[in-house]
Regions:
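Short, surface-exposed ligand- or partner-binding patches at beta-edge/loop junctions that are enriched
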Residues: 54-56
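Structural scaffold elements adjacent to functional motifs in cytosolic proteins
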Residues: 4-6
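Rhodanese-like catalytic fold shared by cysteine-dependent sulfurtransferases
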Residues: 10-51, 60-98
Length: 98
């Protein structure tokens, strides 16, 4: 099983919808600054041994975050969804609106 972590801002999630069942943990604010609470919230909800897929708008930010977890924390089960939520929209994936 995989845990999907939507790292986009609330505004981005509200605009496009989310993957049903995904966890919503904003990693960067609208200015691109890392949100300090992200790590605590992440650690409360996810174990470093879990299979995790980070989701961003187009996949770049989630890829950087996943690589950071692997390189800095040795968490080998961290992944990024290539193309991000925009790829799912192109494929007419059924996103849930909050």
């Amino acid at each position: 099983n995989y845990k999907f972590i939507d790292i986009r801002t609330k505004k981005e999630r509200d605009n496009t919808g989310t993957i049903p069942g995904s966890l919503e943990i904003t990693a960067f604010d609208i200015y691109g600054t890392f949100v300090p609470e992200f790590m605590k919230t992440f650690q409360d909800l996810v174990d470093l041994n879990d299979n995790v897929v980070f989701i961003s708008n187009e996949g770049e930010i989630s890829s950087i975050l996943a690589n950071g977890f692997v390189e800095q924390l040795g968490a080998t089960n961290m992944h990024s969804f290539s193309g991000g939520i925009q790829q799912l929209i192109k494929e007419d994936y059924n996103l849930s609106k909050n």
